[in-house]
């Protein structure tokens, strides 16, 4: 049996939901999958938020992740470098210099 990356992500989330969690940790849920699967995972995450399930996402796909989160934490050398909302994060000059790059836009 072979599953695509997006199918594996959906299966991992479904398997975890069987335990009725209050919180989910999603490690790199948007990495290594095609754009259609990214959109499907984002829809699933939005539905989980509507069910009041807390979600912690760690992902290097910053552009897509910032579109679905309420709060952003950027970690540098093991310490929280930034804490705030996604829109403020994108506008923050220190974050642009350190992490996003000067031309980053959502």
Model-derived regions: residue spans:
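Conserved ABC ATPase signature
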Residues: 1-3, 7
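Conserved catalytic motifs of ABC-family nucleotide-binding domains
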Residues: 20
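Hydrophobic anchor residue at the start of the ABC signature
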Residues: 13
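A short, surface-exposed alpha-helical micro-motif characterized by mixed small hydrophobic
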Residues: 65-67
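Catalytic Walker B motif of ABC-type/P-loop ATPase nucleotide-binding domains
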Residues: 24-28
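Helical segment within the ABC ATPase nucleotide-binding domain
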Residues: 39-51
